[in-house]
A protein has these predicted regions:
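C-terminal segment of classical bacterial N-terminal signal peptides
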Residues: 17-26
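Bacterial N-terminal signal peptides that target proteins for export
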Residues: 1-12
Length: 416
């Protein structure tokens, strides 16, 4: 989701700095004070200099938006790439169609026929799409310097019981082909160039014998020399960064789940580089940004003022754009902070603008009859907005795009 700025690293150089394949520095990690994020004053009052543009991106007739968290700007600086979770499918027992959060239809036991990787031109016209049957849960997306598209598939189609089902409930049918928990590199016309990880991944978490297998990879970004960095961990036991060379050969892994200030993450959800080559990690469940040395992964700074970030993007002027999709809804403990997109400086960390959730305060999200439902505190319907928006990107003209999971939208924000 984040743009990769030139930092001049090599695989050998990274290894020489002692990134350990065991996942942490030799010394014990520095611990964050308990509830450190609670001491940070909410940055809710910055001005909003943007208009919200609804319905900008057009899908083909008969297809509606499903969930999306993956959005990126093309090499041309104007076109927009999206990883979308396969729109709509027929409802159960011939009922009305339902919007989806997965390209795997567990009820029918098959993959969607829709292409999940979409490219729109600057007018919102769909110009190309690909990837049908290849991924279950497109989660993160990145465009490298050559214009290639990288997508993380953050889940799999292995049989599971739905939340709330009894332990002895029958499992859904097994798939004919296991898909998921991989990272793909495509050419701009959709040719598969490289695959990282094995299909289905490793749901048990990081395996010392197979550290290059994933479970719920969140985001991917590339270094100037072509090395590949993947952020993994979406609530399970694994929270780490995994480094590969440009051919896909595993180099090392770093980090573990925790609240510490050195080498610990809890849902490293999005990645970006600034112009100095520092690595910004949206450490979502820790309600912070961790700023790391991109060579050693040593922590340089920790910021709480951008809130609970699902998505992060840094432009060439070192302006940082952070999407908070969970405060007050998925995470009520962070309820003093408002959901939305915070904008500020990657140099000094000052927040200068805030696009609040157009759905309004007190809005909750749920699925009703297979459709996303937003409710205001008074019980009335709420409008679509940045509620559950996870991905954020900015084009060369400063237009902001937010990819939304709950409302099933790609929002556009233009200067007032």
């Amino acid at each position: 989701m984040g743009r990769a700025i030139r930092v001049g690293l090599t695989a050998a150089g990274v290894a020489a700095f002692g990134i350990l394949s065991g996942g942490a520095f030799a010394q014990a990690p520095a611990q964050a004070p308990a509830g450190a994020w609670m001491a940070a004053a909410p940055t809710n009052d910055a001005p909003n200099p943007y208009n919200t543009v609804e319905g900008w991106a057009k899908l083909p007739a008969g297809r509606e938006w499903g969930s999306t968290s993956a959005v990126e700007v093309d090499k041309d600086g104007k076109s927009i790439w999206v990883g979308e979770r396969c729109g709509t499918r027929p409802g159960p027992n011939g009922g009305p169609s339902v919007s989806t959060n997965s390209c795997w239809d567990a009820t029918a036991g098959k993959m969607s026929d829709f292409n999940p990787v979409l490219k729109f031109d600057s007018t919102g016209k769909l110009v190309t799409s690909f990837g049908a049957g290849m991924m279950v849960f497109p989660h993160g997306i990145h465009v490298d310097r050559d214009g290639n598209i990288w997508v993380t598939d953050g889940n799999d189609n292995l049989p599971r019981r739905r939340p709330g089902q009894p332990a002895d409930a029958p499992l859904p049918p097994a798939p004919d082909k296991v898909v998921g928990n991989q990272v793909f590199k495509f050419s701009p016309d959709g040719k598969l160039l490289l695959t990282l990880g094995k299909a289905g991944g490793n749901p048990a978490g990081p395996d010392a014998a197979d550290p290059a297998s994933f479970y719920q990879p969140n985001d991917v970004i590339t270094y100037p020399n072509g090395d590949i960095l993947v952020a993994e961990g979406h609530g399970g036991a694994n929270s780490r960064l995994i480094l590969f060379d440009k051919t896909g050969k595993f180099i090392s892994q770093f980090g573990k789940k925790g609240t510490g200030l050195e080498g610990e993450f809890d849902q490293p959800h999005s990645l970006a580089f600034d112009s100095k080559g520092r690595l910004f990690v949206a450490d979502r469940a820790n309600n912070r940004i961790q700023i790391l040395d991109a060579k050693t992964f040593k922590t340089l700074d920790t910021w709480y003022q951008f809130s609970r970030l699902s998505g992060i993007f840094i432009d060439r002027n070192d302006m940082i754009y952070g999407a908070d999709s969970e405060s007050g809804s998925v995470n009520p403990l962070h309820g003093a902070w408002k959901r939305g997109i915070r904008i500020g400086s990657a140099k000094d960390g000052k927040v200068t603008a805030f696009i609040p959730d157009p759905s309004g305060e007190g809005v909750t999200f749920s699925i009703v009859d297979g459709k996303p439902s937003l409710k205001k505190a008074d019980g009335s319907n709420g409008p679509g907005g940045t509620l559950a928006a996870e991905g954020v990107v900015v084009d060369k003209d400063g237009i902001i795009y937010g990819a939304e999971v709950g409302p099933h939208k790609l929002q556009r924000y233009t200067k007032k």
